[in-house]
Amino acid sequence: MFEIKNLSIQIHNQYFIRNLSLTLNAGDKLAIIGEEGNGKSTLLKVILGICPYAEVEGTIFSKNHSIGYLPQMLESNDLQKTGYEYLFKSLEDYYNQVNFLYQNLERLHIDDSLLERTLSCMSGGEKVKLSILKLLLEKPDILFLDEPTNDLDIETLEWLEHFIVETKCPVVYVSHDETLLSHTANCILHLERIYRKTECKHTFYRTTYDDYVRMRRESLAKETMIAKQEQRDYQKREEKLRQVMQKVEYQQNTISRSNPHGGRLLKKKMHSLKSQERKLHDTNLAKVPDVEEGISFRFENVTIPRFKKILTIDIPTFQVDTRVLATNLHLEVMGNEKVCIIGSNGIGKSTFLKTIYETLRNRSDIRVGYMPQNYEDAWDENQSVLEFLSSIGNKEEMQKAMTYLGNMKFTVEEMNGSIRNLSGGSKAKLLLTRFVLEKVDVLLLDEPTRNVSPLSNPVIRDVLRKFQGTIISVSHDRKYISEVATRVYRFTKNGLVLER
């Protein structure tokens, strides 16, 4: 149904994919995984023929099947359209699909009043829902989804999982949501950049995500064990040969000139030993596998008293302009608590978190780190990565910053490059790096795991779970909520409802 043969993708003389071949059939659900900047979105764009900046070799066959594409970001001209204008080219299109439209509005938990608003006024999750709805109306033969779970509320995430599993057409998707990957994928394409990001590598398996992670872990452990054993055996043989050669060399130096026959035998033996040495040095030893692993970081010396009152907020009427988002909002947070706020898309969670930030930012007794939903609100996009961190301290601190950035898998080029060029996941990791360097003790995080790879997300969850300060976050990541949050509130129009 869909086939790729010997596909290679190169950008600025750097390969992101080399000689990729795979075939997809009806019912295949291919998840593309990997660290940020490894070419996952680029691969989708190349397949769709919308990546003019890439040099491409190889062939792509889709046998005239219609293709549906959910991009990571909407086109700027689409943002000025109303929901109706975005979904339908004409009034006739609307009337032809009105029944199908309202069936799916209900399935996606979309209020039809949303269609009257312009996309620029919608939340991130509302835009994603509308984009998915547009795909459903188009009824394509093959679906390509780039980060479909970004900003979606939990109810819609569960619907999306069910849809991916049940649909008969092939679905190719990029995702960092481990729960969705575990529940939906039956094929895995893992894109990596190894040897300090100088070489690309891909791995394709027809298996589930959980089985792939397990097999990869076991395979790497076995390959590493074999390589280390071969290295030990090699060193033993090399040492034994060296000792024999030293002995023969000593005998050559001390043999009597009156024994030419013995000298010839020793010379012949040394010649044989050197031949053995050359063969030994030519041995192809198994190498310890070079793989792209997740990030590494931790908060050092950050503590906050358990009974310290961090936040008390009471808002009788919570509104933006004339739009009332909620009433009777009340929240108290103490030190060491990890509070997570969940709720439907567009209901006001991110706005509430920003309000909390404005309440806490000027407190002198705490150090607040804020990760907004739109990373651009945290910096000047034209700054370099190191310029963004330069206000932290002296040369020693900057060296420390570079070390932390290295642990976050930033290359030297990325450290010196513009923030604008970073992927969403790299921007999230940059903010986390700043929080570590500033030793913040109160974290306000809006979807902290949203753009980070499934290899790095477990690290982030573990670090935040062990964090000795306070966390107030908004998240739809089910693993994050389960593993990190100590209290979970649902944001409703009537206030915060304690769920756990």
What are these regions (language model features)?
Residues 220-324:
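Flexible nucleotide-interacting loop at or near the entrance of a catalytic core
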Residues 1-222, 303-500:
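ABC ATP-binding cassette signature C-motif
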